[in-house]
Amino acid sequence: MKKVITYGTFDLLHWGHIKLLERAKQLGDYLVVAISTDEFNLQKQKKAYHSYEHRKLILETIRYVDEVIPEKNWEQKKQDIIDHNIDVFVMGDDWEGKFDFLKDQCEVVYLPRTEGISTTKIKEEIAGL
């Protein structure tokens, strides 16, 4: 079985997230999604609208997602690859090159972002109403 992993906050889930998850799943048989915990978001000074538990619940209902795990810190990725027997590490191309150090453990793929949609854009548009 070919296993794929991706990481993100996945707050205010939108069709760009769904397209990323769909394309990530197409790279293997089993997709693990690591989502930032509330504590990790605080460390990153990133505010999420939904709590970790609510984001996890939402992601677990998506047909492309086989497993959801917590992302607690930047450093855990190497261990996650080992612990979950990962073959492919996937991120959006806004992270291009940042995870190349993982190439000795698995294939690293940067997928193009979906044009015209982002959580930041949604938040800005809602704030402008």
Curated annotation (Swiss-Prot):
Triggers of expression: Positively regulated by WalR. Mainly expressed during exponential growth and rapidly shut off as cells enter the stationary phase.
Catalysed reactions, as listed in the record: sn-glycerol 3-phosphate + CTP + H(+) = CDP-glycerol + diphosphate
Primary enzyme class: transferase
GO MF terms held by the record: glycerol-3-phosphate cytidylyltransferase activity; metal ion binding
Main location: cytoplasm
Pathway: Cell wall biogenesis; poly(glucopyranosyl N-acetylgalactosamine 1-phosphate) teichoic acid biosynthesis; Cell wall biogenesis; poly(glycerol phosphate) teichoic acid biosynthesis
Localization of this protein: Cytoplasm
Regulation: Inhibited by the divalent cations cadmium, mercury, tin, copper and zinc.
A GO cellular-component term linked to this record: cytoplasm
Keywords in alphabetical order: Cell wall biogenesis/degradation, Cytoplasm, Nucleotidyltransferase, Teichoic acid biosynthesis, Transferase
Effect of residue 114 to A: 9% of wild-type activity
Outcome when changing residue 113 to K: Complete loss of activity
Other facts noted in the record for this chain: Proceeds via a random order reaction mechanism where there is negative cooperativity in the binding of substrates but not in catalysis.
Biological role stated in the UniProt entry: Catalyzes the transfer of the cytidylyl group of CTP to sn-glycerol 3-phosphate so the activated glycerol 3-phosphate can be used for teichoic acid synthesis, via incorporation into both the linkage unit and the teichoic acid polymer by TagB and TagF.
Similarity comment: family membership: Belongs to the cytidylyltransferase family.
Protein name: Glycerol-3-phosphate cytidylyltransferase
